Amino acid sequence: MIPGEFYISHGNIELNVGRQQVLVTIINTGDRPIQIGSHFHFYEVNSALKFNRVITRGFRLNIPSGTAIRFEPGQFRTVELVKYAGACKIYGFCKAIMGKLD
């Protein structure tokens, strides 16, 4: 085995099966692009992104780990979010939660 090498199964790999998901339409009202990573708590993203923030509490982008989505100034975009799993403790980000979600 080579350090960092992966052995991936053949076929499709399904992500986040059975987790609650929500579609959200967003507009970037700022004058600069905003990029959001795969595991950032969407409720706490840059305030220049306008959307129904309340429904995004406890959700993140439903995209592969380590990737991101970029929102250009003035751009409308609909994205799919997925509910966090596990202990659902949120720390850091913009410090809006700092503990258990429920």
UniProtKB/Swiss-Prot annotation:
Gene: ureB
HAMAP family for this protein: Urease_beta
Gene3D superfamilies assigned: Urease, beta subunit
Compartments reported by the entry: Cytoplasm
Recorded family membership: Belongs to the urease beta subunit family.
UniProt key word Cytoplasm: yes
Predominant location: cytoplasm
Oligomeric and partner information: Heterotrimer of UreA (gamma), UreB (beta) and UreC (alpha) subunits. Three heterotrimers associate to form the active enzyme.
UniProt keyword list: Cytoplasm, Hydrolase
Cellular component, GO, one term: urease complex
Protein name per its UniProtKB record: Urease subunit beta
Top EC group: hydrolase
Organism: Blochmanniella pennsylvanica (strain BPEN)
Reaction it catalyzes: urea + 2 H2O + H(+) = hydrogencarbonate + 2 NH4(+)
